[in-house]
Amino acid sequence: MKQTLLIITALILMLSCEDTQTESSDGIDAGVVINEINYNSSDSFDPDDWVEIYNSSSNTMDLGSWLLKDENDDHFFPIPSNTLLIPDQYLVLCTDTLKFTALFPDVSPYYGDLGFGLGGGSDFVRLFDSNGLLVDMVEYDDDAPWPILADGSGPTLELNHPSLDNTLGENWSASEDYGTPGAVNSVYTGDE
């Protein structure tokens, strides 16, 4: 009897650990990635800071109550409730919606105003799901191997392919001038 009880307890523990792991990795496996970052615009074309996220999964994702943060936990933007991101769709989160839409009037969907900006040299961009679990994180810099042209010259940071490890600077390139918010990246290689 004790042995049966121990086996049942062990099975319950294993199943609960598996469920926890699935929940923890749910965001990572979901395919929602930080895909483009505008952290230091040129003086002549300044929509202010913005971040593009992309749904590379085959599922529609409910991003309601997800959080965008920089390296400071006090700097966060809650994505509005019922924000659905269909497969292959982009979402732009911008610091200043008026400045952003004045220069990119055709981009949709977008949300803002973030209430904080990104560091002009280096910073974190972090995305958390509605359970507070980290979904994606990029720690960019304005030094190699990160593309230096994205630092005030006009281009943005663009991920070469959404399946690449976006924590590595060599997987990012400087965009065409002003970036491609809400659209396929100008540097998209099509290669994983």
Question: What label would you give each PLM region?
Answer:
Residues 4-14:
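Sec-dependent N-terminal signal peptides
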